[in-house]
A protein has these predicted regions:
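Intrinsically disordered, low-complexity regions enriched in Ser/Pro/Gly/Gln/His and often acidic
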Residues: 125, 134, 161, 204-205
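Intrinsically disordered, low-complexity boundary segments flanking structured domains
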Residues: 10-19, 142, 153-159, 168-170, ...
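Extended, loop-rich substrate-binding clefts of extracytoplasmic carbohydrate-active enzymes
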Residues: 3, 48-77, 82-86, 134-192
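Acidic, contiguous internal or C-terminal segments within carbohydrate-active enzymes
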Residues: 72-74, 86, 92-110, 169-220
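Acidic-aromatic substrate-binding/catalytic surfaces of carbohydrate-active enzymes
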Residues: 9-65, 82-86, 90-152
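Acidic, low-complexity intrinsically disordered regions
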Residues: 128, 137, 164, 207-208
């Protein structure tokens, strides 16, 4: 095959266009998100010392954390502080106020929510401290479903030289005084999300723990 000077110029121009294409840094923002919610009631003012209250194999003594055993049957609109990470392929929404969970993950190329995205927040009383919700991705430690899965967490946004961004959500577990952090990281031009974990033992004694992520997805007869 013979390449003419005109063909060579076309190839050169095309290569220049491709080389000039730059990948945009990940966008990160904090925004208000209103979601219909069935609120949890006020916690019991009396401390819970009763150990025989077995929840998923755990002892029922949760002092010094209060216990909530009431849920409202009336739905209200509640505004949450949502942390959004986004690139050209993926949008991730985290809700630090609901246990530091991934609330939604959207494939922007086809509009598909690849995690189960709730339209209504409706807790059930199956958590060690009381309220628990499904959907999205729940990060659990130091035992089974995280005791504080419905409690608000702190968060901070972290920028990296390669244009990626991480939102770190963290809390101090009141039962064994350990600290757990989960980081949700999105990279420029990449169609995947990365999770990072940091655990700290703030005591002078060894502490046992497990770590697992509980992801919810919407399925049908053709789900793979």
């Amino acid at each position: 095959m013979k390449t003419t000077s005109e063909d060579a110029n076309s190839i050169h121009e095309g290569s220049s266009i491709n080389s000039q294409r730059t990948v945009q840094p990940v966008q990160a923002r904090v925004e208000a998100m209103t979601i219909p919610t069935y609120p949890a009631g006020d916690p019991d003012p009396n401390p819970m010392f009763y150990e025989a209250r077995n929840i998923q194999g755990s002892k029922g003594n949760i002092y010094p954390h209060p216990f909530t055993d009431r849920l409202s049957s009336e739905k209200v609109d509640r505004t949450y502080q949502a942390v959004v990470l986004e690139n050209e392929f993926i949008q991730m929404i985290m809700l630090p106020e609901l246990g530091g969970r991934i609330f939604a993950g959207l494939d922007k190329t086809n509009g598909y929510d690849f995690f189960y995205r709730h339209q209504v927040i409706k807790p059930a009383l199956i958590g060690l401290f009381g309220p628990w919700i499904s959907g999205g991705v729940e990060f659990n430690w130091p035992q089974h479903h995280r005791p504080s899965t419905f409690d608000p967490t702190d968060f901070i946004l972290e920028e990296h030289p390669d244009g990626s961004k991480t939102v770190w959500m963290n809390e101090h577990d009141p039962l064994n005084r350990t600290k757990g952090m989960v980081g949700i990281c999105l990279y420029p031009g990449k169609a995947f999300v990365e999770t990072k974990v940091r655990l700290y033992n703030r005591t002078a004694l060894p502490q046992t723990f497990l770590w697992w992520a509980n992801a919810g997805v919407k399925i049908n007869d053709h789900y793979q």
